[in-house]
Amino acid sequence: MTVKTPVYLDYAATPPVDKRVAEKMIPYLTETFGNPASNSHSFGWEAEEAVEKARADIAALINADSKEIVFTSGATESNNLAIKGAAHFYKSKGNHLITVKTEHKAVLDTMRELERQGYEVTYLDVQENGLVDLDVLKAAIREDTILVSVMWVNNEIGVVQDIPAIGEICRERKIIFHVDAAQACGKVPVDVEAAKVDLLSMSGHKVYGPKGIGALYVRRKPRVRLEAQMHGGGHERGFRSGTLPTHQIVGMGEAFRIAKEELAQDTAHYLKLRDIFLKGIEGIEEVYINGDLEHRVPNNLNVSFNFVEGESLIMAVKELAVSSGSACTSASLEPSYVLRALGRNDELAHSSLRITFGRMTTEEEVQFAAELIKSKIGKLRELSPLWEMFKDGIDLNSIEWAAH
């Protein structure tokens, strides 16, 4: 089996741009280059038409109206605009916000910034499977709660939260519900009407589109108001000023159009690859899948290998492009805060690999990856005195390690 290495298995960080998307974008760089806001000539009109077509394609994927789509520079900006924008606008109603400990840093750090501004934030724990306990959420809601923010799909462990149930709870209590759907679009069906979502963050590049473009869905009925965070020419109905990058928007629109059309075949492809990988690593002892395997996107596997050190594992499988933790925080040597929130100990949190498949991943590549990991785990464990002690039946938790 000859497989071209390194094998790219880090699609949750970013996939390549789909060739069909790239082809659609190119004319808007050189030929149809007008500014969509130039309304006095055909260059501007053509660009605006392309932007509105993309807006409609993005809205269609999430069952929204195209007037509810606001373009941003990416999901990080969408999260900032949604959370800060709503918190500032509804300040007179209350100053309490609720989110989850396993959210993306773009949500957690935005919440921390609001805490510095005097808001109160409750960070919910998750269960061992990574899912939010709805009773815990209900108990956290107060009279002055104005916003709840929960991600649809977790970027590290791929678990899918019960967004419709949370939407129901929030709508009943007239609380604004924000969802970070960067990892959900194109992986699971997203319907903002059925799920009663008020604000939804989206990313272009996570769906085989270009980087540097995202969108925020802002509900019109019942209407949600936001305070703008970026001021200027009043673009995007005043929500987000700045010249619209037509080529990026066209790319994101085409990516979302393809994602809607090919969701079923992508899902079948991912499930097949996942089965091949899980079969390939069968028989390795002390392997833990992080996060619920049922309520999960089909292209994500986050696996901890006990008695193997994370950094040495990444180096041992250098023929694979995988990550431990998310790309946004993998430069840090701290164990993943998401895995810690599941109750994993430092050792298991440190020995995790996030393996994420994509549209372009082949069965041969996944087979190769599983076999490589299996052989390297064996070699690394041979070098581990802890593994030897574990195999000898010694309970490592009962040992008092001497401090030096």
Curated annotation (Swiss-Prot):
What Enzyme Commission number(s) appear in the record? 2.8.1.7
Q: Where do the annotations place pyridoxal 5'-phosphate binding?
A: 75-76, 155, 183, 203-205, 243
The answer, when asked if Metal-binding is one of the entry's keywords, is: yes
The active site is formed by 328
Q: What top-level class of enzyme does the UniProt entry assign?
A: transferase
* Matches recorded under Gene3D superfamilies: Aspartate Aminotransferase, domain 1 (3.90.1150.10), Type I PLP-dependent aspartate aminotransferase-like (Major domain) (3.40.640.10)
| Pfam families to which the protein is assigned, alphabetical | Aminotran_5
InterPro entries annotated for this entry?
A: Aminotrans_V_dom (IPR000192), Aminotrans_V_PyrdxlP_BS (IPR020578), Cys_deSase_IscS (IPR010240), Cysteine_dSase (IPR016454), PyrdxlP-dep_Trfase (IPR015424), PyrdxlP-dep_Trfase_major (IPR015421), PyrdxlP-dep_Trfase_small (IPR015422)
Carries keyword Metal-binding?
yes
* Cofactor(s) the protein needs: pyridoxal 5'-phosphate
GO BP annotations, alphabetical order? [2Fe-2S] cluster assembly
Give residues where N6-(pyridoxal phosphate)lysine occurs.
Answer: 206
Q: Which GO terms describe its cellular component?
A: L-cysteine desulfurase complex
* Reaction it catalyzes: (sulfur carrier)-H + L-cysteine = (sulfur carrier)-SH + L-alanine
Location (main, coarse) = cytoplasm
| Residues that, per the record, bind [2Fe-2S] cluster | 328
Q: Which residues form a coiled coil?
A: none
Q: Which GO terms describe its molecular function?
A: 2 iron, 2 sulfur cluster binding; cysteine desulfurase activity; metal ion binding; pyridoxal phosphate binding
Compartmental location: Cytoplasm
Assembly and binders: Homodimer. Forms a heterotetramer with IscU, interacts with other sulfur acceptors.
**What is known about what this protein does?**
Master enzyme that delivers sulfur to a number of partners involved in Fe-S cluster assembly, tRNA modification or cofactor biosynthesis. Catalyzes the removal of elemental sulfur atoms from cysteine to produce alanine. Functions as a sulfur delivery protein for Fe-S cluster synthesis onto IscU, an Fe-S scaffold assembly protein, as well as other S acceptor proteins.
Family statement drawn from the similarity comment of this UniProt entry: Belongs to the class-V pyridoxal-phosphate-dependent aminotransferase family. NifS/IscS subfamily.
Per its record, how is this protein called by name?
Cysteine desulfurase IscS
List the gene name: iscS
